[in-house]
Amino acid sequence: PEKVFAFKDEEFVRMWVADMEFGVVPEILDALRARIDRRIFGYTGLYDDEYYRTFSKWCRDHYDWSFPKEQLCVSPGIIPALYQLTETLCGPDEKVLLNTPAYGYFLHAAEYAGVDVLTSPLHKKADGTFEVDYEDFERKCADPACKLVFWCNPHNPTGRMWTEEELHRVAAIIEKYNLWVVSDEIHCDLIRCGRRHIPMAKVMDRYPKLITCMAPTKTFNMAGLAFSNIIIRDPALRARFQERDKLFGMVNPM
């Protein structure tokens, strides 16, 4: 249903979505202009290594992390990827686990797939920061119906950048119960100076049931261009993910 605000535009501040108020940086604008000057906007796919080389270099330079080319899948966004992964991985009698407060689309993805949700509330400390309740988290992971964990790193909405120790503790629990884990890391570049993001993939460096989701869209205010990077280690899941791609591999020509 349509929502009507009883205020004039100048009387309220829109804060419902994570679009920033800063314009796109000149380097990105220059690249977009160069693309526009080609004057061709037909069906587009990734047919060589250039995109992988560019993204993998960013990951090496900023996170000291690398991954094989074949693991990289592209998606119009992390949200549609969440929907697709949840549908693919979970059956009707299985559950997904997420920490609360949580990004709303984790819940929406589960609801869309008809999957029940387990929640493990984060503990709010006296100083206002949040931490994982490890006992509760493990108890929920131990549920025989639990199949998939949605992990958010950095966390939305609390803003927590998880420490390496915290990531190892969470990873150990997930691996103990052999669960799939989707690590949403879309905010990994929107961090304070002097901090460095630690991908869950660096901590779970040999765990095959990890899916990492990243995109430049939040950091660089490009969400409307609709593209994201989904790194899927498991070959069978990767094949199923790509087979269910209703866009047949097409990407934004920009």
Which stretches of residues belong to each language-model region?
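Conserved PLP-anchoring active-site segment centered on the Schiff-base-forming lysine
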Residues: 88-110
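A short helix-loop-beta submotif of the ANL/AMP-binding
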Residues: 112-118
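A short helix->loop->beta-strand "cap" motif at the edges of active sites that frequently abuts
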Residues: 94, 115, 176-179, 207-208
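Active-site phosphate-binding strand-loop segment of PLP-dependent enzymes
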Residues: 124-192
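Short acidic capping loops at alpha-helix termini that bridge into adjacent secondary structure
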Residues: 67-72, 92-95, 207-210
